[in-house]
Curated annotation (Swiss-Prot):
Organism: Shewanella loihica (strain ATCC BAA-1088 / PV-4)
Pathway noted in the entry: Bacterial outer membrane biogenesis; LPS lipid A biosynthesis
Record InterPro entries: Glyco_trans_19
GO cellular component, one term: membrane
Catalytic reactions on record: a lipid X + a UDP-2-N,3-O-bis[(3R)-3-hydroxyacyl]-alpha-D-glucosamine = a lipid A disaccharide + UDP + H(+)
GO molecular function, one term: lipid-A-disaccharide synthase activity
Family: Belongs to the LpxB family.
EC numbers: 2.4.1.182
Entry protein name: Lipid-A-disaccharide synthase
UniProt KW Iron keyword: no
Gene symbol of the encoding locus: lpxB
Keywords per UniProt: Glycosyltransferase, Lipid A biosynthesis, Lipid biosynthesis, Lipid metabolism, Transferase
Function of the molecule: Condensation of UDP-2,3-diacylglucosamine and 2,3-diacylglucosamine-1-phosphate to form lipid A disaccharide, a precursor of lipid A, a phosphorylated glycolipid that anchors the lipopolysaccharide to the outer membrane of the cell.
Length: 382
């Protein structure tokens, strides 16, 4: 292990949600180890805390089985370089944050070199490819899970796992202030707003921008006073979305915001969004939503054959039943989106809000502190 008194933690975060988790964990670990060094692949929030990124985390932000194949040589080269660098560095612990197809192989190699490894965010082994749990058991000293039902799955297979809760549930208040959010964004305090979130990755916008924009046009016809607001994660995604608007809805007025997705969701009356971590955020800000998603037909056919779940979005998975509508693949059409969004705009939301509140409280556990404590105990165990 690292021979000096300074603790060294290596981390790899694969996308924005991982960057948030990584930043929270770094802050919590610094409480115990103020002089610790953090190195690997991180996003902007991690970098702002002094994290040393060896590669841009955009390298890992690839969606879909088919899409990954075209980038595979580069991904393998990045992983090989990381293995070499970290084997030489010998950190006190390696923490792979999500990105399981990249990180678990990395963890396997590092653990074989005597480096303690943690995987933060359980892969969806309970949903598809369940045999991955045997590789996870070999690759990691411990899994940190965000969702309460995951620990039981790991316990059943005798894989060390700690349920830590979710940082988003800690960060987002139990009650979100719609008027304050609108004031922050300069939105009309009296209008009805639909937030449209087509995803944070280029591949997601490629698949979802067109049906989302076309649905917005139809919704405007049905609700002439309805307004739209869309957060885009960066200038590149904004340009991609603006091209979809120009192509499919040149006359549609949508208020575009760079970043601030949580504020946008809090400002909205309802949300149309891609499946992913954003659905959890929408649940935590207590807004009715419609989840839609599609990938390339080949990716979908391969994935569908491996799936062992009946729900895709986190709110439905946490509830164990469908509490919000999901429009997946062939169902992700403008007309179906319009009908589902209309039901959310016009419906009685009291039972849904009660479900959201219960789930929020289950996940609110001071996740970063719990995760840090689990890592500290692992590192301090000889």
């Amino acid at each position: 292990m690292n021979q000096s008194n300074q603790k060294v933690f290596a981390m790899v975060a694969g996308e924005l949600s991982g960057d948030i988790l990584g930043a929270g964990l770094i802050k919590a670990l610094k409480q115990q180890y103020p002089d610790a060094r953090f190195v690997g692949i991180g996003g902007p929030q991690m970098d702002a805390l002094g994290f040393e990124s060896l590669f841009s985390f955009e390298e890992l932000a690839v969606m879909g089985l088919v899409e990954v194949l075209s980038r595979l040589p580069r991904l393998l080269k990045v992983r090989k370089t990381l293995i070499d660098e970290l084997t030489a560095l010998k950190p006190d612990c390696f923490i792979g944050i999500d990105a399981p197809d990249f990180n678990i192989g990395l963890e396997l190699k590092l653990k074989a070199q005597g480096i303690k490894t943690v995987h933060y965010v359980s892969p969806s082994v309970w949903a598809w490819r369940p045999k991955r749990i045997f590789k996870i058991a070999k690759a990691t000293n411990m899994v940190l899970s965000l969702l309460p039902f995951e620990k039981a799955f790991y316990d059943k297979h005798n894989v060390p796992c700690t349920f830590v809760g979710h940082t988003l549930a800690d960060d987002i208040p139990l009650e979100s202030d719609k008027l304050s959010a609108r004031e922050t964004l300069g939105l009309d305090p009296h209008a009805e707003y639909l937030a449209i979130l087509p995803g944070s990755r280029g591949g997601e916008l490629k698949q979802l921008a067109e049906p989302f924009v076309q649905a917005a046009v139809k919704l405007r016809q049905r609700y002439p006073d309805l307004k739209f607001v869309t957060p885009l994660v960066n200038a590149k995604r904004r340009a991609q979305f603006e091209l979809a608007l120009k192509t499919h809805a040149p006359d549609l007025d949508i208020h575009l915001v760079e970043g601030q997705s949580r504020t946008v969701m809090a400002a909205a009356d309802a949300i149309l969004l891609a499946s992913g971590t954003a659905t959890l955020e929408a649940m935590l800000v207590k807004r009715p939503m419609v989840v839609a998603y599609r990938v390339s037909p080949i990716t979908y056919r391969i994935a569908k054959g491996m799936m062992q779940i009946s729900h895709y979005s986190l709110p439905n998975l946490l509830a164990g039943r469908e509490i919000i509508p999901e429009l997946i693949q062939a169902d992700c059409t403008p007309d179906k989106i319009v009908d589902a969004v209309s039901n959310q705009l016009d419906g009685d939301h009291k039972p849904l809000m009660e479900s959201f509140m219960t789930l929020h409280q289950q996940l609110r556990c001071d996740a970063s502190a719990r995760a840090a404590q689990a890592v500290i105990e692992l590192v301090e165990t000889k």
